[in-house]
Amino acid sequence: MEKEEANNENDLSNIKETVLIKKLTKSFKVSNKSSILGIGDDAAVLNFDNQEVVISKDMLVEGVHFDLSYMPLKHLGYKSIVVNVSDILAMNASPSQVLVSIAASNRFKLDAIEAIYDGIRAACSEYNLDLVGGDTTSSNKGLIISVTCLGSINKKKFVTRSGAKDGDILVVSGDLGGSYMGLQVLEREKSVFEVNPNSQPDLSEYTYCIQRQLKPEARKDIVKALDDMDILPTSMIDISDGLSTEINHLSSSSDLSIHIYEDKIPIAEETKKVCDEFGINPTVAALNGGEDYELLFTISKKNSKKIANNSLFRILGSCKKKKNDNCMITSIGQKINISSDGWDPFNK
């Protein structure tokens, strides 16, 4: 009888929406000065003084953006915030608030939604964000998480995709391809599990790549480092859909071409090992993989010396005046066209 009552309490259909929202959000505190009024009213009230307001929204859909057979719900909640924070950072702005809406089918119980919010809470703590609103509703099928992130920036310092100039240097943070290879490992083990549910794989040697896929981090340190060095990028974008796609976005928005060098693309040794195991060229993983959430940006040539010996950055190439000529120069000097073969949700 007690077990049946516990199950009923865990069933979302037995919980009023107002009670559910209070239960999920009671431990969230407002800490940013710009958050005047948060959860609990019809709308949030924000005050950004004389700053420009930056807004980004991303939706994560089960079966399209994530697979719950290997994605822990807490990690999913965390990642849903990170992908939005990364967009705000790509504008050179400081993220400060999020609104989270979740639609879940009746196969999800209260403890599952609470696990997602545990991840959201952890991300809000990591990136100093206030949860100021959102919605929770039912879904006919699966799970959907929609997040809106707000931030602010001095109007003289926000950065777009369209400001690159001829002669500018192309720079990237971190390393690339790890998230994609982590996904390959997880998909392989899922296939093995479907054939043999008793299999217990040792994934310790894949920790780096799996972590890059399941629990990525947005590069708030990069924006701070650039500011500390008094460098304002001429254009910037985050790498969510693969290096090749983002290069094409920057070049088309700035109305020029970008040339990069294959041997300059940063790829972690852990990623290279997994690529070798799967028979995948590491360069292909970096160019087309996606979900690295590193920052790709251009700077004026005069600033290149400031970052030349900084381990946070890697100079990939430069911008050229000629249009429609994005290319990669290989290690043997071959010129290869860079096409947009990154991740596309409508071509999955």
Where are the language model's segments positioned?
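Glycine-rich anion-binding loops of enzyme active sites
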Residues: 50, 60, 95-189, 318
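Glycine-/charge-enriched secondary-structure boundary and capping motifs
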Residues: 2-19, 23-29, 107-130, 138-145, ...
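Glycine-rich anion/phosphate-binding loops
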Residues: 37, 69-85, 108-118, 156
